[in-house]
Swiss-Prot record:
Aerial growth, conidiation, and dispersal of filamentous fungi in the environment rely upon a capability of their secreting small amphipathic proteins called hydrophobins (HPBs) with low sequence identity. Class I can self-assemble into an outermost layer of rodlet bundles on aerial cell surfaces, conferring cellular hydrophobicity that supports fungal growth, development and dispersal; whereas Class II form highly ordered films at water-air interfaces through intermolecular interactions but contribute nothing to the rodlet structure. The keyword Flavoprotein does not apply. The lineage of its organism: Eukaryota, Fungi, Dikarya, Ascomycota, Pezizomycotina. Coiled coil: none annotated. Keywords: Cell wall, Disulfide bond, Secreted, Signal. Residues 1-19 form the signal peptide. Disruption phenotype: Affects hydrophobicity only when HfbC, HfbD and HfbF are also deleted. Disruption of all 7 hydrophobins leads to altered germination kinetics, decreased survival under exposure to extreme cold stress and increased mycotoxins patulin and citrinin production. Disulfide bonds join 62-126, 70-117, 71-105, 127-139. It comes from the Eukaryota. This is Class I hydrophobin E. Belongs to the fungal hydrophobin family. It is found in: Secreted; Secreted, Cell wall.
């Protein structure tokens, strides 16, 4: 007797909380108030998000006046050397090398994904000049430049609901 009462109570609570109609087989019409609330909230979320860029490959590009290249960097070369030295001398294993100098750059197009720069010792960079040779160039790692760009340029734009959800999930 108590089991049937418990099951009936659970089913009624579930039907109320999930808003699944139990008795009616035909859908009920939506009220105009809820339609106006939905329309108002969707227009607010659209206006709050930044306008889409005309360039669909914006995530792959460097900021204005910078050029994307796949370069061997002093920083990457230094990391490789320090890693090998760190295996021999453990004190050196935590040492970090930081440098904006890069060499052996190969220019990349806007549409090329940064991940396509995957040769050993090569990393995607945003460089000051568009020089493709074995000479030296002043470059910064692509990820660092993009992160700094978005932190500086997107700080005043409110985050969209989709961005908030992605931040929570990741």
């Amino acid at each position: 007797m108590q089991l049937t009462t418990l099951l009936t109570g659970l089913i009624s609570v579930l039907s109320v909380t999930t808003a699944i109609p139990m008795g009616s087989e035909s859908p009920t019409p939506t009220s105009s108030v809820s339609k106006s609330l939905i329309a108002h909230s969707s227009s607010a979320s659209v206006s709050a998000s930044p306008t889409p860029s005309p360039n669909p490959y914006e995530a792959y590009t460097c900021p204005k006046d910078k050029f994307k290249a796949c370069c061997m960097s002093v920083q990457q070369t230094g990391k490789d050397i320090v890693k090998q030295l760190g295996d021999l001398v453990p004190v050196l294993s935590g040492l970090q090398v930081s440098s904006a100098i890069s060499f052996q750059c190969k220019n990349m197009t806007e549409r090329e994904a940064p991940d396509s720069c995957n040769g050993q010792g090569y990393t995607p960079m945003c460089c000051n000049t568009k020089v493709e040779d074995t000479g030296f160039n002043t470059c910064k790692p692509f990820e660092d430049v993009k992160k700094a760009y978005y932190m500086n340029n997107m700080k005043d734009i409110p985050e969209s609901q989709a961005d908030m959800i992605m931040d929570i999930l990741t």
